[in-house]
A protein has these predicted regions:
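Alpha-helical, coiled-coil/dimerization segments enriched in small aliphatic residues
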Residues: 242-268
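Short, low-complexity disordered leader/linker segments with a strong preference
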Residues: 1-70
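Structural recognition of the beta-strand scaffold that forms the well-ordered cores
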Residues: 73-77, 97-100, 144-148, 165-169, ...
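A short, structured surface patch at a secondary-structure boundary
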Residues: 77-136, 144, 257-260
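Proline-aspartate-enriched helix->loop->beta-strand connector
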Residues: 124-129, 133-150, 274-291
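Extracytoplasmic substrate-binding proteins
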Residues: 54, 154-237, 262, 315-316, ...
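A contiguous binding-surface segment within folded domains or other stable secondary-structure elements
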Residues: 270-325
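Short, solvent-exposed loop/turn elements at domain surfaces
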Residues: 65-67, 82-87, 105-109, 236-241, ...
Length: 397
């Protein structure tokens, strides 16, 4: 693997629930927001400079945040994919001194820890039993702390402790992964303008992939559209899919497939279902997220709980797939969002995308946007993730 030369880059105790096992990156939806790309660009405004070198930005919660002149120590709390996006944006993880244990498990199991081994040295101990300890976070002496915009209580506690805190939204764009990724890149461009060209390149590449998929799938009839079931979490006691208010809906809409769980109104990871519903939907294809240890073989062999998958079309035709794990778990928005889109489209409609070589696509994307040359083996690793990717997150097998 080759990549561009990297740039070298205390208070009262307050324990807050971060709810890592259920909702840190999928917290309650904000009232404002739109799915339009115009709005993703308007949310993040140009930073205004002050005479003393400080700059102000508007974060995703609408807060005016004054940034320090130098940002050398960063903590990312409960926006789980952000450490990977930030590392690739900066082409370094050296500034990251603290991240969530759930972000760390993905870094260890996926590609991020290999590309930026320094991220494996980031502290995770400021989370104790899925709760965030402000005193432990303060001990890391961060110049900047990112937090989930929906966790307003945490944001208030961070600022009250004298920390510079920036809110990052995961729901403002109605679970549109591409728009959310674009907005994250816009925000990073405001904070770190020296890399703003990378933000534009990522957004343009994502739009290009969306356009390619639309062109190839636009003539599909309703009968030709595949029925897709997302298995977000699966264990002896849980069977959770993506309803209409979660990332699975966007992935299906973007590739002109049908999310069989669209009828479920529950938001985030709360769309629990039973096997009778799965039988009635009879999906053509099943995608298993990396937020669960379940693998395709578990459905083929009925090795989890008492459920029998043998009559489900996707299982009978061996059309069950584990989602990729590149820089982060690909079910959510992240640095790999354009490649997740292309992989989903090619997997669901192989005949329409027979000219697409995913190894070439991923290598070109990483090189063009991030300046990183991936080997064939590294790309293959992304598409054969282990069960370790789910470590630390919620209920697992």
């Amino acid at each position: 693997m080759m990549r561009k030369t990297k740039r070298n880059w205390t208070a009262a105790v307050c324990v807050l629930t971060a709810a890592l096992s259920t909702t840190p990156v999928f917290a309650a939806k904000e009232k404002e927001g739109s799915t339009s790309k115009a709005n993703t660009e308007s949310i993040s405004t140009d930073a205004s400079a002050k005479d003393n070198g400080e700059r102000t930005i508007i974060d995703h919660a609408g807060n005016e945040v004054t940034l320090p002149e130098e940002i050398n120590r960063i903590v990312v709390t409960d926006t789980l994919p952000l450490p990977s996006v930030l590392s690739l944006y900066l082409d370094s993880a050296e500034k990251l001194v603290g991240i969530s244990p759930v972000s760390m498990s993905a870094a260890k199991a996926g590609l991020l820890g290999e590309l930026y081994p320094e991220i494996l040295d980031a502290d995770t101990s400021f989370f104790e039993n899925s709760e965030l300890n402000i005193e432990s976070l303060l001990a890391l002496e961060p110049d900047l702390v990112f937090y989930n915009a929906q966790n307003t209580e945490l944001g208030e506690s961070l600022t009250s402790a004298g920390l510079t805190a920036v809110a990052v939204s995961v729901t403002k764009w109605d679970y549109n992964a591409a728009d959310t990724f674009d907005a994250w890149m816009d925000l990073l461009a405001d904070i770190f303008p020296e890399e703003e060209e990378k933000a534009e390149a990522a957004k343009e590449y994502c739009e290009k992939v969306e356009d390619q998929i639309e062109e190839k799938t636009k003539d599909l009839t309703d009968d030709e559209k595949k029925n897709v079931f997302f298995l977000f979490n699966y264990s002896d006691t849980a069977l959770v899919t993506s309803g209409k208010n979660f990332w699975g809906q966007y992935w299906c809409d973007a590739i002109n497939a049908v999310n069989v769980g669209e009828e479920i109104e529950a938001e985030r990871s709360n769309a629990s279902v039973n096997m009778e519903q799965v039988y009635s939907w009879d999906p053509d294809i099943i995608f298993i997220s990396n937020f669960t240890k379940a693998m395709p073989e578990d459905l083929y062999n009925n090795t989890i709980g008492d459920n029998d998958w043998s009559s489900v079309s996707a299982v009978k035709e061996e059309q069950v797939y584990k989602m990729p794990l590149g820089a982060y778990r690909s079910f959510t928005p992240g640095a790999d969002t354009p490649m997740t889109l292309m992989w989903l489209a090619k997997t669901v409609y192989p005949d329409l995308f027979e000219d697409v070589d995913m190894t070439d696509e991923v290598q070109n994307y990483y090189d063009e946007v991030y300046g990183i040359e991936l080997t064939d083996e590294q790309v293959a690793q992304m598409y054969t993730p282990s069960t370790d990717a789910a470590n630390g997150y919620g209920i697992s097998k």
